[in-house]
Every structure is written in C-alpha cells, then in structure tokens.
Regions:
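Alpha-helical transmembrane segments and immediately membrane-proximal extracytoplasmic
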Residues: 1-196
Length: 196
C-alpha cells in the first residue's frame, strides 16, 4: 500500500514538473517571438534611416539646403536625447550594465519607459550615422521586453529573471542573426546568476 501511494505521489510530481517545464518553454517562445519583432523592426528601421541619411549626403543638387536640414535634424536628436534621458536615466549608454544589474537583483528597470524611449532614440541616433552600435540597445530592448511579458503574465521573481535573460538573448540573436551566441549568452547569464 505504501509503494502504491509513493508511485501515485511520484506521478503527480512528474506531471507538475512536466507542466511547469512546458509552461516555461511556452513563455520563452512568446518572449522570443515578441522580442524578435521588436528588435527586428529596430534593426530594419535603422537600416532604412541610414540609407535615407546617406541619400541626403549624396544629393549634390541641393547640397546647402540638405546640410542645413541635417544640422537641424542633429539638433533635434540632441534635444530629444537630452529630454528622454532626463526622464529615464536607464536609457543612457549601451544598457548591458543595467540588464546585468536587473538579473542580479540590484535594480528594477521601468520596462515600458525604457522600451519605447530606447527604441525611438536608438533608431534616430544610430540611423543618423552617430558612432553607436546596436548590440547594447538590442540586448536592453530584449531584456525589458522579456520583463514586460513577465509582468503581463504575472510571473514569479525567478521566472521574471529567466524571461529577462531570455529576452536579452532574443535581442542579441535578432540584432546579429547569431542564435548560438545568444544561447551561450543566456546559458552563462542564467547559470551564473541562478545557480547560487
């Protein structure tokens, strides 16, 4: 009789563990899809904007007018950058240190403010030809996208960190078409931070 109850209990534990794993995989897929759309559109708009700016530089017919428009555009970017970074301090820089601090539990990021402000400012700044890369912003956009989905799904703090790391990896993969690098990134981050 005791063996029978042990078997029933083991089956229940296995069923619970299986459903938990499946729900985590499902949440990871949702994060990957949504972050892929966010970062994919980020990358696409950067490329289109860069080609537009490049076309303005190459148009010799209206050189003086085009240079005047470009100077005004860069002034607008500087003003918008100052305004947005004053309202949201965590969009400064690459964003990777903020993501690492969030994963370690040292800070909590305002996911929505960072998502839209970093998205808009990143597109304008990188597409305009300023000396910036898309790796850091893509990782931060992915991480805050993962956090937003975790908040929407009302996940536990451990699941939230896992979805943040998954989002960061999805952002890296979408930015550079490098899924293996993203996999290594998330394994290192998750294993390093959650094994303690």
């Amino acid at each position: 009789m005791e063996e029978q109850s042990e078997i029933v209990r083991s089956k229940k534990e296995f069923a619970f563990a299986s459903s938990t794993i499946l729900s985590q995989v499902g949440r990871g897929i949702i994060v990957g899809l949504i972050v892929g759309i966010i970062v994919g559109s980020f990358r696409f708009l950067i490329e289109k904007g860069f080609h537009m700016i490049q076309g303005v530089y190459q148009d010799q017919g209206y050189l003086v007018r085009n240079l005047f428009v470009l100077v005004l555009f860069y002034i607008l970017i500087c003003w918008l950058s100052a305004k947005l970074t004053r309202s949201e301090k965590d969009i400064k820089g690459s964003g990777i240190p903020q993501v690492e601090a969030e994963l370690k539990g040292l800070m909590s990021l305002n996911w929505w403010g960072i998502l839209w402000k970093k998205y808009v400012l990143g597109i304008l700044a990188i597409a305009s030809g300023l000396m910036l890369g898309r790796e850091g912003p893509s990782i931060q956009l992915g991480a805050v996208g993962g956090k937003g989905i975790a908040k929407w799904l009302k996940s536990s703090p451990v699941e939230e960190r896992s979805l943040i790391a998954s989002g960061a990896a999805a952002g890296l993969a979408a930015a550079f078409n490098a899924p293996i690098a993203a996999l290594l990134f998330v394994v290192e981050e998750v294993y390093h931070h959650f094994s303690r």
